[in-house]
């Protein structure tokens, strides 16, 4: 090859490189940036009960291709059944299914965690760096468990005799502690924060009592329920019934006691008397069930969507955001002044579905959520008090009988009917709570 030909080839190669820099390389980076941005008509944050339910409802409204759900978890759990898992009546495996199996078919699953919400630009950002813009946003992020706010936890769970029905990682530890119980105190806590399913901390107490009686250990046990609340239950009708059970079964209830420390190596739980700040009492335990402090998701706290306490700031009747009209919410992450339960989510879903329809039609919402929620208070291995009530703490019962009484049929509903209704009705957007049936059963009088 001559020198002239060599120079020509080198110049040609350099020209190709410059062209590649100007076109191919930049094009690749442009497409990468483009690929990191997406747009969807309806974006759902969270793939728990509220998120999947609304995803299914929105799919029918605008088509699956126009809906996306952001959720990082591989597994989806029916958490209400964990009360029975902790008492050995159900398996933890029966409570979970792969998230992929519950995401509505055709709806896009963004398997990431939301790290930033920007309602002023109608966009969110995920931990993978992806930016997703939306026309309508449904926030269903649930709440956070804060075991770490109790000194000695979560590392204390490495020791036996301590469990919690609030996590799939710790619920089986409750059952193990119950089985291994020999004699002494069985202690149960309720934190000084909002919680999901406010009845659950005492349900496991009643089941522990029943188990110890069944196994002949009850005479060696002192069962203690320490709650931060000033009442046993928030609705007087059901609280009165529960106090009767507490007295009949010789259970100890200490109001306004908040768990602040667990000394797992010594089997000691330290509670603060909230009526006398700074005053503490140490309880030795043979078994300890911890209900952790809870709070709003970090991504909400301090965001424009949150109220002063960090919860999603909603109109309590329409479930529309109080500031951003194209933002809506459902479930545990909201500031709705009602008990955070799956039953509440079901009732909210029907109202929210209607609200979004009206907003899309540029009309005012016309359906109102009354705060309906339900708590099946498990009182033994075959009885339940089915508490149902509204925003005002007034009973809103479905059946034409006194639901403050323990009933076997209600246990059957809790253990078998409600899980089926959840998986096959609610998550498919087909169950919006018992409202219509309540009206029917009460002959139109409720």
Predicted regions and their residues:
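C-terminal auxiliary extensions adjacent to catalytic cores
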Residues: 386-446
């Amino acid at each position: 090859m001559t020198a002239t030909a060599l120079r020509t080839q080198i110049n040609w190669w350099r020209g190709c490189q410059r062209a590649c820099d100007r076109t191919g390389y930049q094009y690749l980076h442009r497409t990468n940036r483009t690929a990191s941005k997406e747009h969807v008509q309806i974006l759902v944050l969270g793939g728990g009960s509220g998120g999947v339910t609304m995803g299914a409802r929105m799919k029918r409204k605008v088509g699956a291709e126009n809906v996306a759900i952001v959720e990082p978890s591989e597994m989806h759990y029916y958490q209400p059944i964990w009360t029975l898992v902790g008492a050995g009546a159900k398996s933890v495996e029966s409570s979970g299914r792969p998230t992929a199996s519950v995401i509505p078919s055709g709806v896009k699953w963004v398997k990431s965690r939301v790290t930033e919400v920007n309602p002023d630009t109608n966009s969110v950002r995920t931990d993978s760096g992806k930016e997703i813009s939306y026309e309508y946003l449904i926030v269903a992020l649930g709440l956070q468990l804060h075991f770490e706010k109790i000194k000695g936890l979560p590392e204390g769970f490495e020791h036996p005799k301590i469990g919690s029905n609030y996590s799939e990682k710790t619920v089986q530890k409750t059952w193990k502690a119950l089985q291994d119980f020999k004699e002494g105190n069985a202690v149960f806590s309720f934190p000084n924060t909002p919680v999901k399913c406010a009845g659950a901390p005492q349900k496991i107490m009643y089941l522990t009592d029943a188990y110890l009686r069944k196994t002949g250990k009850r005479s060696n046990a002192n069962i203690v329920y320490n709650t931060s609340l000033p009442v046993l239950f928030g609705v007087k009708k059901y609280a009165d019934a529960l106090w009767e059970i507490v007295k009949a079964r010789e259970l100890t209830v200490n109001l306004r006691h908040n768990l602040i420390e667990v000394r797992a190596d010594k089997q000691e739980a330290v509670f603060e008397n909230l009526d006398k700040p700074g005053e503490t009492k140490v309880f030795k335990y043979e078994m300890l069930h911890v209900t952790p402090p809870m709070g709003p998701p970090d991504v909400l706290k301090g965001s424009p969507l949150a109220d002063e306490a960090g919860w999603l700031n909603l109109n309590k009747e329409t479930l529309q955001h109080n500031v951003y009209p194209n933002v809506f919410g459902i479930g545990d992450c909201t500031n709705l002044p009602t008990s955070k339960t799956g039953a509440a989510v079901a009732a909210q879903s029907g109202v929210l579905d209607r609200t979004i329809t009206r907003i899309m039609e540029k009309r005012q919402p016309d359906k109102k959520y009354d705060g309906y929620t339900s708590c099946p208070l498990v009182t033994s291995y075959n009885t339940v008090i089915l508490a149902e009530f509204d925003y005002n703490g007034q009973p809103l019962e479905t059946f034409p009988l006194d639901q403050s009484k323990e009933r076997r049929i209600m246990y059957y509903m809790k253990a078998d009917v409600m899980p089926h209704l959840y998986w096959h009705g609610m998550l498919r957007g087909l169950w919006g709570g018992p409202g219509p049936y309540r009206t029917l059963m009460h002959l139109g009088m409720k």
